[in-house]
Amino acid sequence: MAKKVKAIVKLQLPAGKATPAPPVGPALGQHGVPIMNFVKEYNEKTAHLAGQIIPVVVTIYEDRSFTFVLKTPPAADLLRRAAGIEKGAADPKRQKVGRVTREQIREIAQLKMPDLNARDLEAAMRMIEGTARSMGIEVVG
């Protein structure tokens, strides 16, 4: 018989630098998960992605064991990196804070494809372009 799921927790943590401090400790501690085990495993699996924010979905079972699935970095994070900016525009309709090329959009869409509900690369690119527009990033080329 399969283990009974107690909770599912979604977190966004820096790759290779998770600590038992908030938000990890309180989120997992309230479900009785051994926090240090999670932190150690997460940091091992994400060490090669240092500097990025990696979303993780932690499934916690009744016996206090857990499994987790790593997702791709948020599109906004990847766009900020590609455009070389710190943060998006406060008023994206009037203010443009950076530029990305269609080729950069294609690369981001290919990376994000497993986590997007798009059937093909073109649809994924349109989603990423929409995110860029909402951040005040201009898509050129």
Swiss-Prot record:
**Claim: rRNA-binding is one of the keywords in the record:** yes
The answer to whether keyword Ribonucleoprotein applies is yes
Q: Keywords, A to Z?
A: Methylation, Ribonucleoprotein, Ribosomal protein, RNA-binding, rRNA-binding
What's any GO biological process attached to this entry? translation
Q: Could you name the Gene Ontology cellular component terms for this entry?
A: cytosolic large ribosomal subunit
GO molecular function terms listed in the Swiss-Prot or TrEMBL record: large ribosomal subunit rRNA binding; structural constituent of ribosome
Instruction: Extract the Pfam families matched here.
Output: Ribosomal_L11, Ribosomal_L11_N
Q: How is it modified after translation?
A: One or more lysine residues are methylated.
Name the family the entry cites.
Answer: Belongs to the universal ribosomal protein uL11 family.
Q: How does it assemble?
A: Part of the ribosomal stalk of the 50S ribosomal subunit. Interacts with L10 and the large rRNA to form the base of the stalk. L10 forms an elongated spine to which L12 dimers bind in a sequential fashion forming a multimeric L10(L12)X complex.
The protein's role, per its UniProt record: Forms part of the ribosomal stalk which helps the ribosome interact with GTP-bound translation factors.
Recorded protein name is: Large ribosomal subunit protein uL11
Gene source species:
Thermomicrobium roseum (strain ATCC 27502 / DSM 5159 / P-2)
Identify the gene encoding this protein: rplK
